[in-house]
Amino acid sequence: MASLGELERTVMDRLWSASGPVSAAELREGLADRGLALTTVHTVLTRLEQKGFVVHDEARPRRFRPRATREEHAAELMHEVLGQAGDRQAALARFVGGVDADEARLLRELLDRG
């Protein structure tokens, strides 16, 4: 999976937080503090679409939405990183060793549900 640059991550955060698909102009308004040109927002959205992070509808103006939820994206990243580990068991052990008691309890519950 392709990585996200800082501006791409900011745009994705806005898309994930939106209640539905949004236009480039709406995204630009939400990023007004950044002083971005509309063409810049379009460029970022095009790159995100090429990387597989967003999809758009055919309406005019185009409205964009994330291809996956934030949680689905995080799960995809975890699977990708685990797939790159030379020793999956060791990687999982190190991961589990770093979780707190509540997260460990949640992991046990999820594993028990299968």
Question: Where is each model-derived feature located?
Answer:
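A short, conserved structural fragment
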Residues: 49-59
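Short, cationic-aromatic polyanion-contact patches
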Residues: 4-7, 59-78
